[in-house]
């Protein structure tokens, strides 16, 4: 009896765990299936496939001209794919006109009507859709409160700040309650301090509204600070997608590694393997170790982020460390951190980034011979294949 009872309880527990895991999976909001696009004989997008879950803040990151804005315009309906399909909540919308797509869009210049008040700018969409005026007023009042624009409802665009204009554009884009909001570099025209503040505001508003955000930017810091998921584009193709931490810590190509922040690339030849520990000879610059299975005598590139490196001290370390020496050739102060450049014996440049509090502990100057340390576990390789 006890054995039967135990088995029954165990089965119930497994069913409960299974149900919970299923319910925690967010439903899919947007799916791009093998999207390709050319303008004349110039390919702009090449076989793009993306899946974005409901409530996600997804960022398309890439250099100017990589196709990210074209992809956004395609989802909105301003461009048509040459090949592939677009789905929202399981419904194909590839051939739907702009006005029938359940999306909102914020343009780079916000496109506010200068002759209309804040209230009337926000009301444009629902009035076009012939929504009753009391319902329009109710929705606008709710959005004015969320965006902290209550005192500006009767103001005109030329009389409000850039940050306030951005919030008006957001309210106008979401008043028709779209399934997904598309944002085409809406912060790029703002000064750096305001841009940082509005990034935080946008994230908070997205959490409040619960709308899926698809955000286009060429700014790495902006992408990583705002996104729950992101992808990096180059020349019309996706190089890698995942969480910001995944892409930063586990890049799958040298392009992604270099695109997301600074990085040191160490070129050498595999000298020895002991278990999963590999020794890489850097020629005149010395040797380092990293954890990977690589064939001996093979040419190999390894990478380490500047913030994972520090200057030698007598402090003991509880993990295997690498050590390199060189001449300090530059020191650049950036407020909260300091960047150093060290010339190694083979002439290559090695970058170090220290938080200000750590940097002031080192009394070093240009021209000094210095020694740097970094953990074996912080060195990674990239298999481009």
PLM segments and residue spans:
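Glycine/charge-rich catalytic "coupling/switch" loops of P-loop NTPases
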Residues: 284-331, 357-385
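Conserved coupling/switch loops of ABC nucleotide-binding domains, chiefly the family-specific signature
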Residues: 82-85, 135, 235, 267
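ABC ATPase nucleotide-binding domains
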Residues: 98-104, 108, 112-258
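The feature captures the beta-strand-to-loop junction immediately N-terminal to the Walker
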Residues: 61-63
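ABC ATPase nucleotide-binding domain helices that frame the ATP-binding cleft
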Residues: 69-72, 168
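Conserved ABC transporter NBD signature motif
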Residues: 84-92
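Helix-to-loop junction immediately C-terminal to a conserved catalytic motif
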Residues: 76
